[in-house]
Curated annotation (Swiss-Prot):
Its main location: membrane. GO terms for molecular function: peptidase activity. SMART domains: AgrB. This is Putative AgrB-like protein.
Length: 197
């Protein structure tokens, strides 16, 4: 669905200025990413609204996205599956309880330690950056984690540390395995649906 829309947009942009734009493949890839983030954000906001926690869901989504960009992670084969799984994970982590103010610190540090141990993670088909660049991205992630913990303590933005915790958990071997199994489940569902139509 998102891939088709991205392809249509890429062809339209290419038709406007064929000589100065990138290839249709590159444009499609870029549009797919943009559409994925927009669609995910809309779904997160809708689910947050249904749960009466729109601000919490937005915090988790933003923090999770920043951490994901900086530290990598397993990817699904279809962007719509990725969107739905992201919303599912964000919804699940939103139910983690906060017994007291120290829970924010514990969740942030736990997520940070998992990121320290397991990041960066790349799939075989992904571009791997230089070691220098990866160290820089990881440092930025650590700075954001500290900032998110401080903001959680000062401004009650618990969702920021939950996003860090979510990313840390998804980088673990168990998190990667669960993501891969869900990817296979989604793909099998698609094949079954195609056979039935």
């Amino acid at each position: 669905m998102l891939e088709r829309l991205a392809l249509t947009l890429a062809h339209q942009v290419k038709a406007l200025n064929a000589e100065e734009t990138e290839s249709v493949e590159v444009l499609t890839f870029g549009f797919t990413i943009i559409l994925h983030y927009l669609f995910t954000l809309l779904l997160v906001l809708a689910v947050g609204l249904l749960h009466g926690e729109i601000w919490l869901f937005l915090q988790i989504a933003l923090s999770f996205t920043f951490m994901r960009v900086l530290t990598g992670g397993a990817h699904l084969d279809h962007s719509i599956g990725c969107t739905l799984l992201s919303v599912l994970f964000i919804t699940a982590i939103s139910w983690v309880p906060f017994a007291n103010n120290y829970a924010w610190i514990l969740y942030g540090i736990s997520g940070g330690l998992l990121i320290w141990k397991y990041a960066p993670y790349y799939e075989a088909h992904q571009v791997v950056h230089t070691e220098h660049w990866e160290r820089r991205k990881k440092r930025i992630a650590y700075i954001l984690i500290v900032l998110f913990i401080i903001l959680a303590m000062l401004m009650s933005t618990q969702g920021l540390v939950l996003g860090v915790l979510l990313q840390g958990v998804l980088l673990t071997p168990i998190g990667l395995k669960v993501t891969r199994q869900l990817n296979r489940f989604i793909l099998k569902g698609g094949e079954t649906n195609e056979e039935n139509s």
